[in-house]
């Protein structure tokens, strides 16, 4: 009997378009000799719509249904996704997707799911909290100032200008895929950047700009996590924003990255240490800055990295000899393993 994968995609965050791209790639790459895929679209308003079911590889003309094509009469209660022995693959990015919300819901339903649990998802989603956890684990971070809604913005800008130097990068604490990120060269630009970031979150991070290469490491496993050789993001733009990443196609990747064996060893060790520090499960992508001074800063952990066929995470594992279909299969097995342990601990 085939294993059922419940594919959740869309979502309420600003990254829902990325989710659709990732989910379509998963839908096409699944080994249909072993799996059946059932899909549910989550609308921007949070509604669950039962969309499609695939028992064999979809044709090139097949697309996952989205706002423009779904049948709203197929809206269901969120709990309707439940199916005994099915594994959920929540291909959801950003808030209300990889921040622990959906993970908690799936645990209430007693369903195994791909990826990190409630705690590690919520920790990694919040950039400020992640930095504090990683600092306690002895992992170097880019200097930063945290600003929370309600703070005296003028005083915080003065703190930024005292502790950091321009340029600085301003980021919503709970957002991914470079949404809401701005580069500031002076105080006026910083004020505008803060206004933009606060549109997405009530907690904002201002980081020191660094001249650095962007290096990424893939992680796979539960308590026995393994890492990939690093890959490098090669940019044709000033910085890695949302449009460059997903719309303008101005990003290329160098896999493996052309860095020394010593640097590779440090990055892989730090990535695995960070994954364990947050209690990671299943998968993550660990992003580093490697400065022109030879400094290595861990930038962030993505617990549900972009999963399209051209995304860094699956390409990193392909370089290690694990194909995209095999990667999906391994993630399903890891989901079942972590579910069994979670249920055993509750007995």
UniProtKB/Swiss-Prot annotation:
Positions annotated to bind Mg(2+) 2: 300, 302
InterPro entries in alphabetical order: ATP-grasp, ATP_grasp_subdomain_1, D-Ala_lig_Van_CS, D_ala_D_ala, Dala_Dala_lig_C, Dala_Dala_lig_N, PreATP-grasp_dom_sf
PROSITE patterns registered for this protein in UniProt: ATP_GRASP, DALA_DALA_LIGASE_1, DALA_DALA_LIGASE_2
Binding note for cofactor: Binds 2 magnesium or manganese ions per subunit.
Protein name as catalogued: D-alanine--D-alanine ligase
Domain ATP-grasp: 131-333
Pathway: Cell wall biogenesis; peptidoglycan biosynthesis
Organism per entry: Streptococcus pneumoniae (strain Hungary19A-6)
GO CC term (a single one): cytosol
Job description of the protein: Cell wall formation.
């Amino acid at each position: 009997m085939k294993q059922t994968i419940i594919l959740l995609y869309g979502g309420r965050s600003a990254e829902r378009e990325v989710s659709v791209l990732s989910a379509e790639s998963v839908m096409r790459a699944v080994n249909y000799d072993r799996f059946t895929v059932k899909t549910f679209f989550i609308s921007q308003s949070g509604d669950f719509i039962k969309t499609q079911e695939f028992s064999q590889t979809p044709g090139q003309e097949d697309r996952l249904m989205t706002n423009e094509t779904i049948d709203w009469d197929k809206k269901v209660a969120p709990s309707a996704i439940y199916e005994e022995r099915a594994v959920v693959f929540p291909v959801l990015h950003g808030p209300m997707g990889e921040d622990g919300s959906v993970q908690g819901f799936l645990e209430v339903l007693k369903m195994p799911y791909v990826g990190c649990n409630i705690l590690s998802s919520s920790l990694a989603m919040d950039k400020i909290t992640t930095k504090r956890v990683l600092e306690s684990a002895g992992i170097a971070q880019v200097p930063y100032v945290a600003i929370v809604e309600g703070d005296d913005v003028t005083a915080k800008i003065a703190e930024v200008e005292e502790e950091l130097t321009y340029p600085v990068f301003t980021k919503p604490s709970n957002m991914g895929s470079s949404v809401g990120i701005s580069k500031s060269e002076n105080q006026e630009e910083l004020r505008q950047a803060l206004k933009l970031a606060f549109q997405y979150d009530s907690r904002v991070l201002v980081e020191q700009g660094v001249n650095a290469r962007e290096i990424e490491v893939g992680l796979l496993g539960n308590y026995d996590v393994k890492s990939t050789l690093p890959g490098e993001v090669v940019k044709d733009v000033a910085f890695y924003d949302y449009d460059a990443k997903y719309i303008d196609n101005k990003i290329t990747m160098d896999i493996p990255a052309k860095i020394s064996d010593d640097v590779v060893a440090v990055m892989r060790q730090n990535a695995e240490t960070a994954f364990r520090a947050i209690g990671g499960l299943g998968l993550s992508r660990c992003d580093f800055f490697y400065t022109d001074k030879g400094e290595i800063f861990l930038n962030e952990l993505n617990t549900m990295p972009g999963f399209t066929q051209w995304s860094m995470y699956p390409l990193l594992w392909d370089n290690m000899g694990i194909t995209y279909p095999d990667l999906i299969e391994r993630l399903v097995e890891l989901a079942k393993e972590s579910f069994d342990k979670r249920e055993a601990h509750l007995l």
